[in-house]
């Protein structure tokens, strides 16, 4: 069998049993309203595969490179997206935009939806890709005590959720004050910025 992997800064790749590395995709459809070309995959992060072979994967941010993730957090905008690669026709398309650092994804037990973690949103959401609710998004867990970094289906049908760090009141307050964040970015050295409590 092949191993499909998300490689930050490069895209979606496949490793064959013979250890051959193949690029599956490194771009998706461009946002029609975007001034900047956002078709290149900057930070492909996590993936899962639907029963029909479609690969759903998260791209944490379309604005920043891997080493610039703190700036994405400070900006506190929905720069992330969920992308789908369909091996049946070789197409890649964005299925959800405007997400706050989607950083973890898994096909749900219903096999018609995916669960994904939004790190800066401190939440888990569901996106229905098949069935009567196809295209809908719903909140599953909101206001988590920490920053979710991954979600996986457990062998017993439940889910494992990893938190990369716990929330801090000072950072939560700063996220509600865009003027404060802007002044901090302009006047304070990067290594002294207020950051989330990441392990």
Which residues does each predicted region cover?
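Short, conserved, GDST-rich strand-edge loop motifs in beta-rich repeat architectures
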Residues: 3-6, 57-77, 164-199
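Short loop/turn segments that connect beta-strands within beta-propeller blades
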Residues: 16-20, 85-90, 128-133
